[in-house]
């Protein structure tokens, strides 16, 4: 399994990057996870409406910090999902080596931990001129030394060219 921790500020192009890789390799070969997913589920149960204003982003960031300190649920969720993906492929006697997993994580210390514990590489999607940070997780995006940096500083064609280079660097067969 090829595991990549993906980060970038709001609107940097993380989702576009991940979805284009999924489109190129096939839906069954690319999984997109996020440590914030269980936090969003929790937040919805207590009234969050799914919108991501600066106030909402700070709320989600603070809630994630609390839950991580309490019981490490975001990382437990990721590890459980990775086990599920691995077992799914092994059940059908298919090598998980042909699978790419993107995990969205914002906090530098959590990125470092995930890279170490999951044998992952880190990717920063950088886009000049995006909105300013409303919370520490967004503000700390650049406070990590990433393995791969994708400069999303032009048009979609340029981003797609960088995605093609990324695809050439990994050893996963397309559909």
Across the structure, where does each feature detected by a protein language model lie?
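Conserved lysine of the Walker
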Residues: 14
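ATP-dependent small-molecule kinase phosphotransfer cores
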Residues: 34-98
């Amino acid at each position: 399994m090829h595991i990549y921790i993906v980060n970038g500020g709001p609107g940097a192009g993380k989702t576009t990057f991940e979805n284009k890789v999924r489109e190129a390799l096939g839906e069954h070969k690319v999984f997109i996870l996020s440590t914030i997913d269980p936090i969003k589920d929790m937040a919805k149960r207590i009234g969050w409406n799914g919108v991501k204003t600066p106030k909402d982003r700070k709320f989600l960031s603070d809630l994630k910090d609390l839950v991580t300190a309490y019981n490490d649920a975001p990382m437990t969720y990721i590890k459980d999902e990775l086990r599920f993906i691995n077992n799914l492929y092994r059940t059908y006697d298919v090598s998980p080596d042909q699978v790419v997993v993107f995990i969205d994580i914002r906090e530098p210390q959590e990125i470092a931990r995930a890279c170490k514990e999951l044998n992952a590489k880190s990717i920063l999607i950088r886009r000049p001129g995006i909105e300013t940070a409303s919370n520490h997780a967004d503000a700390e995006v650049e406070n990590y030394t990433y393995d791969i940096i994708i400069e999303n500083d032009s048009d979609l064609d340029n981003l797609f060219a960088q995605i093609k280079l990324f695809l050439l660097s990994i050893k996963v067969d397309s559909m």
